[in-house]
Amino acid sequence: MKVQQYRLDELAHLVKGELIGEGSLQFSNLASLENAEVNHLTFVNGEKHLDQAKVSRAGAYIVTAALKEHLPEKDNFIIVDNPYLAFAILTHVFDKKISSTGIESTAQIHPSAVISETAYIGHYVVIGENCVVGDNTVIQSHTKLDDNVEVGKDCFIDSHVTITGGSKLRDRVRIHSSTVIGGEGFGFAPYQGKWHRIAQLGSVLIGNDVRIGSNCSIDRGALDNTILEDGVIIDNLVQIAHNVHIGSNTAIAAKCGIAGSTKIGKNCILAGACGVAGHLSIADNVTLTGMSMVTKNISEAGTYSSGTGLFENNHWKKTIVRLRQLADVPLTQITKRLDHIQAQIESLESTFNLRK
């Protein structure tokens, strides 16, 4: 199979960059600075990578004008303001796309479902009653769309995905393998020592340009819908409980868990393994560092942390012992000790004229 190649001047045009060098050069792929060969295009994202760039074998470099001045021994460049963004754009040029359309013979499609002629439905896909699949959408093998599910245009649904509960996906949504959208939320009413299941009557609404990784669970609402606004990106192994509302362009890293009826604002970042308790509200532009545990509302933008960073093991054990000892000391006693120490410091400053 012949590898598709692209001219350097064509690639520069796609990212609105300035071409310096030989525009007719052909490139078969993007590559890292370390592993690039002469038929590869690479990028330099900051001065810290200049040493690698100087010894790289790449045929051309995506750089800023300032970074180019540090690479006089190189000949071919695409000059842009943001090399990383240009790289992101060009990954889609070299990405291997699925060009098939139509419905595979092993797929099971309910007669009432509306499937675009430009969509692709893979082997052993099951699509239920009154479903809709939009133009240019790809649904890979063994995926199941239960009744009344709607998938918009230009979506990609990977294999072994389940979409249920009448979920609605807008355009350009990407969902990766083994994720469940619209599953039953964790709702139970306690009575007389038993848990009584609450039927989950809501759905899931997913906006444009949302990306959801593998092995995620996004539960449908109990009454109101679970909502992911436009541009939300979610890593693998994330749990989003019923009635959660996530604002546009929020990013959630792997192993995060968000309990029911919590609202997260726009442009937030949840780093890996964060936990968010239920029925809370988080403002726009909030960043939670890794393993943070949110137990109360966050009303102001900013960066928040909890938990303990890594210690050498013996140091960690000593710290835990001290924390336990501290917990046994009444707060009033600690306050008195601090007041006494402060008084001693002020007395010394006065005696030796150390006060500024």
Swiss-Prot record:
Active site: H242
InterPro entries: Hexapep, LpxD, Trimer_LpxA-like_sf, UDP_GlcNAc_AcTrfase_non-rep
EC number from the UniProt entry: 2.3.1.191
Record GO biological process: lipid A biosynthetic process
Record organism: Acinetobacter baumannii (strain ATCC 17978 / DSM 105126 / CIP 53.77 / LMG 1025 / NCDC KC755 / 5377)
Gene3D superfamilies with a match to the protein in the record: 1.20.5.170, Hexapeptide repeat proteins (2.160.10.10), MurE/MurF, N-terminal domain (3.40.1390.10)
Family: Belongs to the transferase hexapeptide repeat family. LpxD subfamily.
Gene Ontology molecular function terms on file: N-acyltransferase activity
Annotated Pfam families: Hexapep, LpxD
Subunit structure: Homotrimer.
Identification of the protein by name: UDP-3-O-acylglucosamine N-acyltransferase
Organism domain of life: Bacteria
Pathway annotation from the record: Bacterial outer membrane biogenesis; LPS lipid A biosynthesis
PANTHER family: UDP-3-O-ACYLGLUCOSAMINE N-ACYLTRANSFERASE, UDP-3-O-ACYLGLUCOSAMINE N-ACYLTRANSFERASE 1, MITOCHONDRIAL-RELATED
UniProt enzyme class: transferase
Annotated Gene Ontology cellular component terms: membrane
Annotated SUPFAM superfamilies: Trimeric LpxA-like enzymes
Keywords on record: Acyltransferase, Lipid A biosynthesis, Lipid biosynthesis, Lipid metabolism, Repeat, Transferase
Job description of the protein: Catalyzes the N-acylation of UDP-3-O-acylglucosamine using 3-hydroxyacyl-ACP as the acyl donor. Is involved in the biosynthesis of lipid A, a phosphorylated glycolipid that anchors the lipopolysaccharide to the outer membrane of the cell.
Catalytic reaction annotation: a UDP-3-O-[(3R)-3-hydroxyacyl]-alpha-D-glucosamine + a (3R)-hydroxyacyl-[ACP] = a UDP-2-N,3-O-bis[(3R)-3-hydroxyacyl]-alpha-D-glucosamine + holo-[ACP] + H(+)
